[in-house]
Amino acid sequence: MKNLKLYLAISYGLIWIAGGALYLTGTGLNTIPGVIVASSCMLFPLIATLVCQAVNKEPLFRHIGIRWRVNRWWFVGWLLMPVISLLAIGFTWWFAGDRFSTHSEILTLMQTSLNEQLKMDIPLWGILAFTFVSGLFAGISINALVAFGEEAGWRGYLLRQFEGRNFSLAAVAIGAIWGLWHAPLILLGHNYPQHPVAGVFMMIVVGVLLTFVFQYVRVKSGSVIVAAIMHGTYNAVANTALVFLNESNDLLDGCAGLAGFAALLVVGVALFLFDRYVTRERIFTSPLRQ
């Protein structure tokens, strides 16, 4: 684990500096400057990666899994993100009870806006289809480009540091590091505005569960680019469940809440069973390989 401490010091240090600046200036995450700063934080793992490579006198951007040979796992990873979102919608409906409605205020506004733009009545399934299709295209383009800033670190440089260790233990470690890295922004209201302190621990769980999915597809595809596409697409569709709510609970609802935990567990278990009984590679229980 060469230079792991340096990598963590840089990636964590930069986001705490950014979060501290937002806090001291009273800049909210829902403001334009706040959005710009929060989005820029996604570059910090890449910066940490490049600094570590420079210190080690390694070629920059090498050995972090940048491979452009497309295989079926590129598409599997990309399309899994709407599946996770759909599962999260189902579990949100289960947890939310009367708070869940197909006539919620947000959904009604979306439907009215689309009806006016397209000059036709759009059914509920049409709104969902529009949301997922636009999310898929955002995920494979601008969102993937931004998400690469994180994935070059988490599923690139950091994955390499854990190479040779047990896949699942590496996923837990990398996921926990990734989730905790968000702490400064979580404390400022990102993802869990109602429960910022509890949200820090919730985000660690999200990070671990999501890492099992990202890391498995990263290994199967052989490319960190796929992880960036998955991350970008996930960000685009993760909050879809929230449009069905008249009143939300950030610890329960959507991909960041318990509904998301359940959705990720379903997908994670499905991948584990596929790995164990279909391909019989047993990646989940084997030493990690890029």
Tell what function each PLM region has.
Residues M1-I10:
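N-terminal membrane topogenic signal
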Residues Y12-G20, P82-G90, A176-L185, G232-L242:
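Aromatic-anchored segments of alpha-helical transmembrane domains
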Residues Y23, T31, S40-S85, F91-S113, ...:
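Membrane-helix interface linkers and caps
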Residues A54, P196-A198, G222, M230-Q290:
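C-terminal membrane module of polytopic membrane proteins
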Residues E116-N143, L258-G260:
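Hydrophobic alpha-helical transmembrane segments
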Residues A147-I177, V219-S223:
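Membrane-interface helix/loop boundary segments of multi-pass membrane proteins
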Residues G175-G199:
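Membrane-helix boundary elements
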